[in-house]
Amino acid sequence: MKPSIVAKLEALHERHEEVQALLGDAGIIADQDRFRALSREYAQLSDVSRCFTDWQQVQDDIETAQMMLDDPEMREMAQEELREAKEKSEQLEQQLQVLLLPKDPDDERNAFLEVRAGTGGDEAALFAGDLFRMYSRYAEARRWRVEIMSMSEGEHGGYKEIIAKISGDGVYGRLKFESGGHRVQRVPATESQGRIHTSACTVAVMPELPEAELPDINPADLRIDTFRSSGAGGQHVNTTDSSIRITHLPTGIVVECQDERSQHKNKAKALSVLGARIHAAETAKRQQAEASTRRNLLGSGDRSDRNRTYNFPQGRVTDHRINLTLYRLDETMEGKLDMLIEPIVQEHQADLLAALSEQE
């Protein structure tokens, strides 16, 4: 391992021990904000510190085994120990490199999930419903909370658009690679000839920002309309003009919220989604500029991004970004998404490591 990396790891290990000592200080325990901040830092440094301690121990083992090579009686055993220690050292070095990768500050945050029906009419709306159910099942398995912010139902089921807030540990970091185009190939229930149709939906995942970090929005840049919402088939969701539509004039971003009976609550929800959308648009623009020379696995939520194809007749799901195909569609639609999410997270880490090596 490079001396510069070892020096960085030593500094992080020392900081971990320093923070541990500070957390036992009565003055810091009394200051809850400081105590919480240090507790978070301690948790973030723990894996690096533990892994580095293991690596240091293995270096000692390598040194001891090399010294034993000079003893004819111990040589065979020393060679075996040396081989095992070097293998372990390589594994730990790879782990440490991943742990040193720059962290996305948004990864630990809650997220807004938007699913929109694209091309394909009623079938696209039905598939949007299937996708939302898939994500809800995944959230349920991870003990995350799903709160619907706004929805527009399809005429024959599913959704034209649905927005939900998902709350829990590391939601955005886990779901952020879902942003982009999702395509379905299947025989619609209304198809009498048994022909396979292709429909599409777009998914956008955005971090929920604390109030202090929301972009400054000039009230003069907003057009706010109130209306009475009604569900599919004319069923009234509510019977007062409490539904809110906010248009951000400079960007053209439109957010509707009609889930609550209170206009005030709908407006607050719509503004939080609007802030997240503006932030996401700014972030995507910045990332596009930064990553223009290498691929960006993080979809923009634009329909031109083709993330996955879900082929029902073949029971196949394909992630086009990493050329991964699995014949486990039923499990996928039931929310077993880790088998698709984990490979793309690993690919993203590999890209970051490659970029880091180029810089060095």
UniProtKB/Swiss-Prot annotation:
Post-translational modifications: Methylated by PrmC. Methylation increases the termination efficiency of RF1.
Single GO molecular function: translation release factor activity, codon specific
Superkingdom of origin organism: Bacteria
Keywords per UniProt: Cytoplasm, Methylation, Protein biosynthesis
Places the protein is found: Cytoplasm
Residue list for modification N5-methylglutamine: 235
Region annotation (Disordered) ranges: 285-313
Cellular-component GO terms for this entry: cytoplasm
Transmembrane region(s): none
Presence of the UniProt keyword DNA repair in the record: no
Entry-linked InterPro entries: PCRF, Pep_chain_release_fac_I, Pep_chain_release_fac_I_sf, Prokaryotic/Mito_RF, RF-1
Keyword Nucleus: no
Record function comment: Peptide chain release factor 1 directs the termination of translation in response to the peptide chain termination codons UAG and UAA.
Similarity section: Belongs to the prokaryotic/mitochondrial release factor family.
Descriptive protein name: Peptide chain release factor 1
Organism: Salmonella paratyphi A (strain AKU_12601)
